[in-house]
Amino acid sequence: MAKSDVKGVNLGMGTGRRKSSVARVYIREGKGDIKINHKNFDVYMQLEKLKTIALSPLALTHTLGKYDIYINVYGGGISGQAGAIRHGIARALFDLDEEYKMVLKSNEFLTRDSRKVERKKFGKKKARKSFQFSKR
């Protein structure tokens, strides 16, 4: 459930994960400021594709510009971090207002993407790629 912060404003919290990245997201009503690790959103996320991935829960629920979002993200690369931010924003929106649940769940934003890099096996070049086979 949403908690209220010092000023009495509703505060939604969510933790998102993707690959090896973890994002802690805090949402409250405001002007639409988005900060990632104390940096502006446009400075931290420079690729347009990753921006749309990270903000897709807000676009889906038509809440872009209604909330101030503070994100602390660590681990992994920029693609995994964008996915973790998307997951965290979706969970925080659900925590703030439960009427978003059906919209977010139907688009699978509340589900954690469990795909990770497969480990390399011994006797092989990569996880699945084998060395060249010679009959003779």
UniProtKB/Swiss-Prot annotation:
GO terms for molecular function: RNA binding; structural constituent of ribosome. GO terms for biological process: translation. Pfam families: Ribosomal_S9 (PF00380). InterPro entries: Ribosomal_Su5_D2-typ_SF (IPR020568), Ribosomal_uS9 (IPR000754), Ribosomal_uS9_bac/plastid (IPR023035), Ribosomal_uS9_CS (IPR020574), Ribsml_uS5_D2-typ_fold_subgr (IPR014721). One of its GO terms (cellular component) is cytosolic small ribosomal subunit. Keywords: Ribonucleoprotein, Ribosomal protein. The keyword Transit peptide does not apply. HAMAP family: Ribosomal_uS9_B. Belongs to the universal ribosomal protein uS9 family. This is Small ribosomal subunit protein uS9. It comes from Borrelia recurrentis (strain A1). The gene is rpsI.
